[in-house]
Amino acid sequence: MLEIIKNLEHFGLSTNAARAYCSLLKSNPATGYEISSHAGIPRSAVYNVLSKLESMGLVSGMGEKPKRY
């Protein structure tokens, strides 16, 4: 998994974004809370990370409460 994260960082993703993306590859759909728990990203940062991944077209959100990715 570390090699995948390093490769994603090479393409411009932050460490947290790469970890969130890998978490979603393993289990999706998932809520921000679930992604935070699985990827080891602080909940205070996970939604900003997911928003960036959405704007890059790498993930898409669905639903309202709770939003799943």
Question: Model-predicted segments: where are they?
Answer:
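Glycine-centered, phosphate/nucleic-acid-interacting loop/turn motifs that mediate DNA/RNA or nucleotide
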Residues: G57-L58
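A short acidic, leucine-rich amphipathic alpha-helix
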Residues: E34-A39
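Short, Lys/Arg-enriched N-terminal segment that forms or immediately precedes the first helix
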Residues: M1-H10
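Short, hydrophobic-biased segments on the C-terminal half of alpha helices
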Residues: L50-S51
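Short, Lys/Arg-rich nucleic-acid/phosphate-binding segment
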Residues: M62-Y69
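Short capping segments at the starts of secondary-structure elements
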Residues: L25-T31
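Short alpha-helical "packing" element that flanks the helix-turn-helix/winged-helix DNA-binding module
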Residues: A17-L24
